[in-house]
Each structure stands twice: as C-alpha cells, then as structure tokens.
C-alpha cells in the first residue's frame, strides 16, 4: 500500500439532497472523523449546494457530539461535466423518457467521476471510507447507481491507487420510505423535519413550492419519488 488510510474516517458525497443528508447522519453515527464533498457541475438544481450548511448546522444541534466529528466541507467545481453532457439536469430542456428507457436526467459517468474525485481527495486526506447515497431499489434506473457498478469501480480505484478504500452505500437496498424511516431511527422527528425542510431534491431547483414532504416542483421524477416515499413512510407510521 502506498498510502495508509484511517478506516475510522469517512468522506461523504454530500449534495444537500435527502439521500446524502441521511447518509451524512448515518456516517456520523458510525465514524470518528467525517468530511463532506459536494460537486458543482453546472446542474440546474445547484440550489442543493446551498442547503448543505443548514443541514450541517441542524445535525450539530440534533446530536451535539457529532459536531466534534465533522471536519472539512469540500466543494469541487467540474463544469466540464455539463459541457460534455446533453441532459435535462444540465440543459434547460423538458424532462422526458429516452428511447433507451432512461430519463433524460441521466448524466452519463456522473457517479463514476464523483467517486473517482472523492477517492483522490480521500487518498490525500488519509480517509479510508467513502459514503454515497446511491440506491437501486427506488430510483430512476441510472446504471451508475447499481451495486455491481459501484463494487467494480471500488475495485478499480483500489487497484489504480494501490490502497484499500471501503465504499459504503447505506441506502442501496432501501426504498424512499425506508430512507425516511432511517432518518427517524438516527435522529427522531428532529432529523426527519430537518431533512424535510432543508434538503433539496427537485431537479428543476424549485424552492418556492412547499409540500408536506418538502420543497419542489412536485412533477419531476425526483419529486415524485420523494413524495411517494414520504406518503408510504407516513402510512406505515400510522398503521403501527
């Protein structure tokens, strides 16, 4: 090994969305040192990046002991991703389903690039854990969110950097209702309310329209998944 990594430390891919906010809480409950990394890649919903500070402040209030675990908050600018992509996340076009069965919100290579940049940063910081909110249970079919893809990439990164990163994807087999339930388990109603009010999911960057599950247009695939998960989470809570 060319670099000794601390496996009680983790770098969380933290966009400011529901999934990454839940993953950050999950990581803080398990690791001794936690840093975060967000990406500004020309996304239409860049407002998500503005949500991160509020979420971090809220997490510190909910669990004061987490404040001592939180380290640097990193942001990388990679506008080239928008330059080479022709998608509804990086262009002002209507969201639609493509002929390949994927929505045109799919940004080819996005998660592959994100994790590669994250690994390079973690290598320099001596961090052994990488944490991402990817999921193939309740998602839009993106191939770079799949468990097999991410395991293969982790193997390639470890071979290419001669090291031993561990990739953690705590939401991989959870649907959106289970993600809300995980937030409840980690921080009670306070964490659920924090994520509902201050995380951002909407692909169109809408923060003016308030719903019971949070803010968003209510129509894009991301909003629909979040709304469906919230409804099922609430119904399950009522049933019990």
UniProtKB/Swiss-Prot annotation:
Its EC number is 6.3.4.20. SUPFAM superfamilies: Adenine nucleotide alpha hydrolases-like. It catalyses: 7-carboxy-7-deazaguanine + NH4(+) + ATP = 7-cyano-7-deazaguanine + ADP + phosphate + H2O + H(+). ATP binds at residues 14-24. Keywords: ATP-binding, Ligase, Metal-binding, Nucleotide-binding, Queuosine biosynthesis, Zinc. GO terms for biological process: queuosine biosynthetic process. Catalyzes the ATP-dependent conversion of 7-carboxy-7-deazaguanine (CDG) to 7-cyano-7-deazaguanine (preQ(0)). This is 7-cyano-7-deazaguanine synthase. It comes from Rhodopseudomonas palustris (strain BisB18). The gene is queC.
